[in-house]
Structure formats: C-alpha cells, structure tokens
Amino acid sequence: MQRIPFPEVGIAYWFNRMAKESLMVAYGATEADAGSDLVSLRTRAEHVIENGQIKGYKITGSKMWISSGAVADLYTVLALAPGGPSWFLVEKGTPGFTQDKHEDKHGIRLSNTAGLSFDEVYVPAANLIGGVEGKGLLQAQAVFGYTRLMVAAFGLGAGEEAIETAIDYANHRIQAGGPLSEKQGYMLKLITPHYIKFEAARAFIDETAKKLDVNNHGQATEGSIGKYYATEAGNKAAEDAIQALGGFGYTKEFAVEKIKRDVKITCIYEGTNEVMEMTIYRGRWQEHLKSRGAYYNNIADEMDAIHAKNPEVGANVIALGLRALATVLEECRLQRLTRHQYITFKLGELIANAEVAAAFCRAIGNGKIVEGCKFDAETLKAMCRVNAKETAYDIASRGAKLVLSAGTADAAALLNATHFVQIEANMHGCIEDSDKVSAKLREIFRK
C-alpha cells in the first residue's frame, strides 16, 4: 500500500489501524475470467450519489484464489468503476461481503485461499485507493516489479531446500562402494546444474532488487524475468530432488515431496509463467525496436568489456549468445514471425535466460558475491562459465530453430549469423567445471 498514492490522511488512518489492531490484509484481484489478465475484470463499483456528490460506491461481483481470503480483516479489491478499474478498501463484516470456503489445494495447504463475494457492498468514497478512478491497473503494474521478484525468491528458496535435502541424502547413501554424491552421472544429472541456476538467479534477483531500492518503482520486465527463471528452476529442482532420493523422495517422510507440491504455485500466482514469457517478450521487443536492434548488442559489448577485465567468468561466450539473440529477434521482425504466439513465448524464455546469464557474469566478473552465498570466488567463476556457455548454446541453437521452423531463412547463413560455431568451440571445459562445482557441493553439505 505504501507504493500506491493514498491521500496522506488515508495512510495515517489505515496504517495506524493495521498496527494497533494487527489487521491482516488480503489482495483481491483475481476472478474466474480475470486471472493474470486483469483487463477482463467483471466486478463492478457503482457510484452512490448524494446531493450531486459521489458519497461512496456499491461493489458487486466475486473474486477467487485470494490468499488469506477467509481470514483477513481488510481487503484491497479491484473493481470496474465508471472511471475505469480502481482499487477499494473493504473491511470484513461489511454488509453484503462474504468469504467462501478454504480451497483444498495441491500445495501450500496451510495457506488460506478462498473466494470473495460482493453483493452491493457499500464503501465510502474515501476507500477509493489513490482518490482517482481508473488508476487500478497502473497501480497493480507499479508493484509487479516487487511482487514478482518476491515470488522469484520463493521459487529459489524452495528449490535450494529440495536440492540441499538431496545432497545430504546423497552424501550418506552408499551405492557401489561409495556415496551417491561421488557419482558423476548422479550429480551432473540431478544436482549440480540446479545449483548453478540458483546462483545465476540469485545474482539477477539481487541486481534487480538493488535497482528497485534506488528507483522505488518500475522494473516490471525484470521482475517478470526473475519470477520466470527462478520459479522454473525451483520447480524443476524439486522434481529432480524426488528422483534423487528414489523411493524415499516419493514418501511424505522426506520434505522433497511437500516442497514439490508447494513450489508449483510459484509458477502460477502473480502471473502464470506463460504470462511472464509474454510480458518479457513484449518489454524487450519494444527495446529491440526502439534501439533498431542495438539493445542486446550493447549488452554484449558490456560483456566483452567484463571479459577483458576478468576472462574467467565466460562473459565473452554470453556476449556471443546476446548477439545471437539480437539476430534472432531481428529475423523475427523481418519475417513477421511474432504473429505466432508460440514464438513470442519462446522468445520470452530465451530473453530471460540471456539476461540472467549476463547478470551472473556482471556480478562475478566484477567481484561481487551476493550476501549469504555459500561459495568461494573460484567456484562461482566455474558456475558462471558453465551457465554462460550453456545459455549461449541454447540461444543460438533454439533461436535458430524457432526462426527456421516458421520462416524462410537459409539455415547455414542463420547459424553463421548466430555465431553457432564460435559458441560450440567455447563449450570445452563444461564437464570439468561442473565436476568442480560438484566437489564443492559435497564439501559444503557434508555433515
């Protein structure tokens, strides 16, 4: 609420009440036909006129999937007022306002989730957040940078806990004369790649959080990138942690089964990850167009400068990947391939991977270690190299595949333009670096 332009009297009144009465607040936006797409809003707020002035509003409609919906004391509710989508404060117990039953969910089962119903619920005009109608969607978007980055941290933490449980198990589980954690195939398939992604995600989340601290707003695309990358990584890590524990992982005796159920919601709420892909694509597509293709080439130049200063983090390779991304985006523009929604989704994914890898190189290349990191500088460099190489290879190969699958480009020319052979030539050392990371994981988590 402090990010939204309340009248000063509103801030003092509501914040004092929240503090003194320990009020729990719920966020009421989602509807049956308006999930990640809030434009489809159906809940209405009609004027109540007295002596020619707007005295208040009567809200009618319903909400669903509201966190703390049945237990909150105060609700921020998005409704369509005559002037456009607007947020209103509604107190529990207001006549006509009812809370539905707690949903029986797949995961986060202790978190209350319920629907809300409004039958001509009257609220005074002072309860219009911001004091002006029609600002609701802008107000919601203003906090997406924060809220989606918060969910990114959820996904990262859940994935880490799952993999750390698996490492602990692998350090003690003896197979074929030694612990599972010493088996290269086990580690490089089920454990090590996840921790490399975690550290990349941590670097990006930290970088974006610092920007938010300075700018106090915006970063909607960056928040979407963080949420998409970290929650996809956390969800896949939890799934592989179950596999890493074998039959034990499938039982409720071990935490990984619960983590897998809980982490899945991070790929859904605060905007599904498909909406994140679309949001990322839209934001960076505009940057590509405005810069006439220079946006990712400029970041590539930055990576080359980092490589000149610190050649041990793979920044030169992700620079090739970023230039490949610029080429793929330009081919999509020239051939009008973004008319295919699937391609826009996949572009969003490639963009997210590229920007996270660049942030990782930026942090480690400049000697910045995120607070709370478990790894020394040399291990982080090895992680960064692996991530940069694999991300660049993925961008060049999958980006070319996207263009070729829907367009008419010459395959050989496209592979040359995306620097595919150069990227391939830089893949040397990935297994060796991954083994170094595995050794450090065994050391850190051996109890």
Mark where each language-model region is.
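Glycine-rich beta->alpha junctions and the first turn(s) of the following alpha-helix
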Residues: Q99-E199, K264-Y269, N273-E355
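Glycine-rich phosphate/cofactor-binding loops in nucleotide/flavin-utilizing enzymes
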Residues: Q139, F248-A315, V403-K447
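Extended, hydrophobic alpha-helical segments in both membrane/secreted and soluble proteins
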Residues: G10, A140, A158, A162, ...
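A short core secondary-structure module
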Residues: K55-Q99
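A structural signal for short hydrophobic beta-strand segments in well-ordered beta-sheet cores
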Residues: T43-H47
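Short Gly/Pro-enriched turn/cap motifs at secondary-structure boundaries
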Residues: D33-S36, W65-S68, L80, K105-N112
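FAD-binding glycine-rich core of flavoenzymes that anchor FAD
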Residues: Q2-E31, I49-Y57
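C-terminal helix-coil-helix/basic helical segment that borders enzyme active sites and/or dimer interfaces
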Residues: A170-N171, Q175-P179, F198-Y229, I242-L245, ...
